[in-house]
């Protein structure tokens, strides 16, 4: 069995070496009209350079409300200068400041010619047409030089960037109204098992609805890809083979169920019959040990366990970085963060455990008298094993218990994996 970190690294390396991602995705770009529909750009991966069309700021820009002047004019506290005009955002003072003069200036306004500093209004008093300065002025205060943020032609957003509101604001600022973004990869989802029925069907006494298909489609969408949800496949070789072949028309194929070692677990053998290379089929985690990663007909294929909590965990660990690469994005490291345990943990060693949990921000159990109310505290939830999706829904994260430290005490720090889209 592979440690989950090694399995995740193998997925990333395989996608990079065999599919040439993320760079190869820039060639299949789509164009988004930003003024028409900025929502369409959120979460997309940029497939071009976005460069500054001029210097930013394009002028020396005040960062405070106050008065602009020559600093030499206020060498001593108590100096009075004649107020000769105003500079505000969008309207510059038209003249040049001379010695003994000052100009009222507002935040975001151009620094007048001749001025080399701005004094905040809190340090002044107005006396008719004069302004009294309570402190001596210093050169270069409270303004930003033209071009300090970006020079004309400088790349301000590189390709491969995931677009959020700040990136879209930068694109708008530099006049990039149309953005090239990578095509969203299509992810085929096939749930397997004779026990599955459609969501709108009434299950028989020993049947269940196909919740895995829905949860996987939601996870695929949260990563920024396009889910293609197929009908479930029965545990029958010919039907499963046909479902896999149809799924290989997408950019990535996800199968859930049928990956263990039972009589009706047919996924791995069917993939081999189709010429697939199995890169791993067992990972040292619980839940999620019987996870398959394969390469078939030039496409990545994942066989995830059928138990729904296993499916959720293994998707985040292994499938999410593959989709990010196919989107043209270098996957981020697994977003673990530390939290203090609300209670002891006693698990078996030999593999890593991902336990449904909830993190809150409160006084830590080891220091409730003095701890600030910002300490993340995590507690696991009662659950009935990897089929208990209700436990995951009641939580907002998974607690990682590493194989090297299966026994943990209350108050110790442990790693938490946030549930995507919730925490």
Model region roles, listed by residue range:
Residues 1-5, 177-304, 308-314, 365:
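Helix-rich terminal scaffold detector
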Residues 2-5, 50, 65-234, 382-383, ...:
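Short, glycine/charged-enriched hinge/interface segments at domain edges or termini
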Residues 2-8, 22-34, 38-39, 48, ...:
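Flexible glycine/proline-rich
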